Amino acid sequence: MLGAMLHTLLLLLLAELGALLASGPESQSSFLEIIFPEKIEDKTHSEEQISYIIPINKKQYTVHLQKRYFLTNRFMVYMYNQGSTSFHSPNIPAQCYYQGHIKGYPNSVATLSTCSGLRGFLQFENVSYGIEPLQSAFTSQHIVYKLGNKEKELIFNKNSRNIEMPTNYGILINKKPKSPFKNLFPLYLEMSIVVDKALYDYLGSDSNIVTNKIIEIISLINSVFAQLKVTIVLSSLELWSDKNKIPTVGEADELLHKFLEWKQAYLTLRPHDVAYLFIYNEYPNYMGATYPGKMCTAHYSAGITMYPKDMTLEAFSVILTQMLGLSLGISYDEPEKCYCSESICIMNPRAMQYGGVKSFSNCSLNDFEHFKSNEGAKCLQNKPQMQRTAAAVCGNGKVEGDEICDCGSEAECGPDSCCEPNRCVLKAGRACDSKSPSSTCCKNCQFLPEKHQCRPEKHLYCDIPEVCNGSSGNCPPDVTINNGHVCKESGTICYNGDCPDLDRVCESIYGAGSVNAPFACYEEIQGQNDRFGNCGKDNRNRYVFCGWRNLICGRLICTYPTRMPYNPPNNSTASVIYAFVRDKVCITVDFGSSVKEDPLRVANGATCDLDRICLNGVCVESRFLRDQSKTCSSKCHGNGVCNSHGVCHCNAGYSPPNCQYPTTKRSASLWSGKHDLPMERASKNQEKKWLLSLYIVLIILASVFLIGTGWKGLKQCGSKEEESMSSESKSEDSTYTYVSRSTSETSSMTSTSS
């Protein structure tokens, strides 16, 4: 019977794959902006409906959001390790996904998650923006970037066929009436997704990262299917993390057939309406395959979809939406006969090339009504139990749900534990769990006293130490001085509580006299794009070339102050490279696999050029951060600075919220757990004024004395012997590269004239 059905197999031979950019902001279009989204608080404090103000390109947009649920309460992630299967409930909250619209733009769609900062997409009528938090979500800093658009050139595989439109859908598509939307009742499509090994690696080789990206795709798809009152529910996710379980190369019908056989053998016990295999292919000949109109036919409810190189999640969600639409009996639109309220309809063959909101056309709705009238949607009428709260598991070492504490198993907890291991509550007489990593204000199961420092400052002028409040075992959240506050005379600005000083880092590694190398050294070493000089690695473990503008934002290169070879401490696997460039000896080290984080990776916030800082390997303008910090701190009346929440943090002797009036009470800001600004910092300006007055008086006295003694000496001295000047010849600039792999290995030297 399967062979008889293959003639209805629909191949998506769409070659519009090109130059749709990767799903990270670093490879998006040139528009990229650092922003500070602001949540609009309401009196109800309900999280079911929330709103944000999001600035884009100097304009404020108000986004209204409604919570959406599309993970089943039995949702599991399946993985493989050396052939054995493991499954787990992912550590991902199910109640932080939202959909909504942008105020004043009736055809807009917002698809965002709030699990850790704001992450997702803002889709206007013909343009889309991605938004995601920077590394430290507590700073409220996000980046917003413009997604690819229809102007991008198309890249074709040299073996790919021309664009073909399917000719036989098994559905009547001509002369579609322009009927209004009919009343629809809610339907639920349970989906099981399988990710092949290549795509798993391409998306990050990390189960949490890949799971989050798949959920983002499902969220985008739901924003389109909401028009049909269809909710796409993710029931299970399988990651082929070690190797593929079936071959993933070949013709579309062959792959679909193999996946269908595998699905029937291995997914039987996992409830689902349809199963899809996502395959990574850099330049595929086709986009996917499925059986049109067979969603509720168990032996044919499957599909495969290709994920090309450099494709955005938004573009891939369009492909998957079209595939699911075909399975639901919805054919491709004929543009001259079908219309929708958007600039392009979702079932238009070229929809994936366009940014912005997309919707189903009148033709699509008629197709779907026809599909339902023939009982094609009977399997979609049962509503699965949705996962609305994270299920707490007592004994796993994580505090979840209503748990007060969780120290793990009985053996892990031990007899001295503050926590009851089987009930996850505190033992009688215990105030807190001192074994919990987050309980830095707890000792011997009791609260530490008020004012006890629980988190030291990273930098004197960019951070403030947190102290315990005496009534909680947890240290207050980390709040820093606002990013953009100038922390050094050279113009360096605060970033995430630190004052990134490359000279200081060089000195700490190589000793006194070592400073950040001149740009010529970065050109020489970073230009090689190898383990010594690069801007990180991509998803395929290849070194990323920094580009001329971003050379200083890769790996740190320093000047070397001595003639003794550098010996990395306690690291026999490290390799050292020296470069002699324009009379400077420059150095950098590859620490190899012995370190988890590269200590020479240039930190975010480090200065890379005039009025520019490094941000995720890119040299970007710092003007916005500086201006935002100045504007915020201007409301502190010169007696304080803004913190990372945009609230004045007052100098000693001044009271919040605006540091305008003196106070006898020591209170730095409205945020509890914070000391005042240090006294030496608060009185810095007054001290400078006093010292300046003293210097002026001393200078006047010294001048009077020197004039008197100078006149006397002038009489006694008739002439002065001239000194001869010695001249120095200067050699031409040369570049020398010396690589020392270890003390036992042979050293080599190459030279090129510049």
From Swiss-Prot:
GO terms for molecular function: metalloendopeptidase activity. One of its GO terms (cellular component) is membrane. Its main location: membrane. Residues 187-384 form the Peptidase M12B domain. Gene3D superfamilies: Collagenase (Catalytic Domain) (3.40.390.10), Disintegrin domain (4.10.70.10). It is a single-pass type I membrane protein. This is Disintegrin and metalloproteinase domain-containing protein 32. It comes from Mus musculus.
